Swiss-Prot record:
This is Ribose-5-phosphate isomerase B. The gene is rpiB. It comes from Mycolicibacterium paratuberculosis (strain ATCC BAA-968 / K-10). D-ribulose 5-phosphate binds at residues 8-9, 67-71, 100, 110, 134, 138. It comes from the Bacteria. It holds the Pfam family LacAB_rpiB.
Amino acid sequence: MRVYLGSDHAGFELKQQIIAHLEQSGHQPIDCGAFSYDADDDYPAFCIAAATRTVADPDSLGIVLGGSGNGEQIAANKVPGARCALAWSVETAQLAREHNNAQLIGIGGRMHTVAEALAIVDAFVTTPWSKAPRHQRRIDILAEYERTHQAPPVPGAVG
């Protein structure tokens, strides 16, 4: 599987570890930057690049990394069609795939040991999308909002 990766300085070392792990696992990691350590770099360009390439390649996944994974997830989700979940455990990585058909996850490089992060990555890349109708319905609602910017009706709301 192709896996696009983007990180800033805070996720740079972990990204290198993940790339090596993915290669050893038979995957095709594609580095979208940062390409060298720069303590003053900014995450948006790297995360948007990884998300753009992931969305354009339907059979791929993506991983964005920074200090917490929060800003990186936000940046990736600015790309139309991207569904990036913050994964902080094996379970959240699995649920991102099963329930949300997330194509990307954000991981905090300062939040996990290398072993923990690799377990999250493995869970993400090996967990299939459930294709459950209730989950697809929710994805469709979000896609329609993204397309039209018209919020769905709030069930039970008056007026």
